[in-house]
Amino acid sequence: MSLSHDDVRKIAHLARLAVSDADVEAYARSLSSILDFVEQMEAVKTDHVAPMAHPQDTAQRLRDDAVSEADQRERFQSIAPAVEAGLYLVPKVIE
């Protein structure tokens, strides 16, 4: 799959990335080669391959879930720019 320069600019815009005109060609080649590789992987027949949850089939010993740090929520929220009902308020970044 070959991406055009306009495709790269659109992807960069959607991802909120600044891409210079000098870099568009290199990004188009790199992204196109990645998409070509994905197409090759999709062509592989995996109908009879059992799905794996994890490549190593071993049991993990888990440690006890114990509090190891003091609760400093009030201290951290006192220095935060904006807090409401115990939650941190941040600027909207997604339109």
Swiss-Prot record:
Keyword Ligase (UniProt): yes
SUPFAM superfamilies reported for this sequence: Glu-tRNAGln amidotransferase C subunit
Keyword terms: ATP-binding, Ligase, Nucleotide-binding, Protein biosynthesis
Reaction(s) catalysed by this chain's protein: L-glutamyl-tRNA(Gln) + L-glutamine + ATP + H2O = L-glutaminyl-tRNA(Gln) + L-glutamate + ADP + phosphate + H(+); L-aspartyl-tRNA(Asn) + L-glutamine + ATP + H2O = L-asparaginyl-tRNA(Asn) + L-glutamate + ADP + phosphate + 2 H(+)
A GO BP entry: glutaminyl-tRNAGln biosynthesis via transamidation
The keyword Protein biosynthesis appears for this protein: yes
This enzyme's EC code(s): 6.3.5.-
Broad class of enzyme this protein falls into: ligase
Any coiled-coil regions, as ranges: none
InterPro entries: Asp/Glu-ADT_sf_sub_c (IPR036113), GatC (IPR003837)
Function: Allows the formation of correctly charged Asn-tRNA(Asn) or Gln-tRNA(Gln) through the transamidation of misacylated Asp-tRNA(Asn) or Glu-tRNA(Gln) in organisms which lack either or both of asparaginyl-tRNA or glutaminyl-tRNA synthetases. The reaction takes place in the presence of glutamine and ATP through an activated phospho-Asp-tRNA(Asn) or phospho-Glu-tRNA(Gln).
Summary of subunit composition and partner proteins: Heterotrimer of A, B and C subunits.
Family, per entry: Belongs to the GatC family.
Protein name, UniProt field: Aspartyl/glutamyl-tRNA(Asn/Gln) amidotransferase subunit C
Organism: Thioalkalivibrio sulfidiphilus (strain HL-EbGR7)
Source organism phylogeny: Bacteria, Pseudomonadati, Pseudomonadota, Gammaproteobacteria, Chromatiales
